[in-house]
Amino acid sequence: MLKFKFGAWAVVLMLTAFSFSACDDNDDETYNPPANITEALKQLYPNAQNVEWEMKGDYYVADCWVTGDELDVWFDANANWVMTENELDSIDQLVPAVYTGFRNSNYSSWVVTDVFVLTYPQHPTESVIQVKQGNLRFALYFSAGRRLAA
């Protein structure tokens, strides 16, 4: 019986040690994109500070601060600006037309979980309000004219 207990504990300890070694967190490593990508960010947002880069799929994404706002700026492999995502602290920071559009929608009583403004080079700005009610979750896209996109 003692042999079985020792063997069981040995397996538990080995699995625990393996689990911790497999959870290597590489947050300390800095990703550096190609020079044309960093130059594109400097051209678009010359005052960007505290820039941290990562890859999301095929896109280079700069997490940075510009005039007090935290932005995620997306570029393709050719250093073309794809979009900028600005996460807002509150729904109250939305432009009044979008705020009113949301308040007049069927989702106004739902819990707001996140609010973003998406800016594109060739398309109108969109506001995204993520809401939940119970197990249901939706991302509501509002056009610049306050209309809920279908």
Question: What are the functions of these language-model segments?
Answer:
Residues 24-27:
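Bacterial signal peptide processing site
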Residues 30-150:
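First exposed extracellular module after export/assembly in secreted or surface-exposed proteins
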Residues 1-10:
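Bacterial N-terminal signal peptides that target proteins for export
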Residues 9-17:
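Hydrophobic helical h-region of N-terminal Sec-dependent signal peptides
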